[in-house]
Amino acid sequence: HSDVVPIETIMTVVARHFALMTEAGFENMTPSCITSFGIYTEILHTWETHPEWEEKTREFLWKATKREFQKPKNLAHTSDVIYKFRNEIAAQKKYSLVDIHTGRPLQVVDHIGCHYAKMFPSKGIGGAEFPAVLSGMVSAWGGQPVDYPERRHCCGFGFRNYLVLANRGFSVANSKKKFESMQPYEPDFIITNCPGC
């Protein structure tokens, strides 16, 4: 988003989030927003490779808020945390992802938010091409993940795509393409790990 908001501003906003985390006594961060996860990952990487940017950000944050921060010891998307405990959750579940009338596993299509693993494939479970975070949960809980041709296609949401009126046609066209790709498989439901999607 640095073409719309200066990168220094984005870094300072992220630093404020880290400061709030630090002030609350937490060491780990688990954002549910895919875009935030991608931005936090990118900024931590930038600070690692360009420490002068981190120092500049610390100065901006202090000047604006009189706050300081520690970087998170661990950064994981919320879906990664749930995935990590999927088997423990399965052992305690009351219901499985199974049709109660037929015993057939529910057919589930997933949509992985673009900023989950496309920017940094090593940070997402299964990487960018074959993300397994949601399908792994579905399998562990008795459902049947369904692969479909446009599984990795963007849903079209994107802040610039949906929030800017002139771009909404692009957003709707992407969603339509995605839904049409799912339709022949007659899924019982769709899951996603992105609140925007």
PLM region spans:
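Iron-sulfur cluster-binding electron-transfer modules in prokaryotic oxidoreductases
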Residues: 1-197
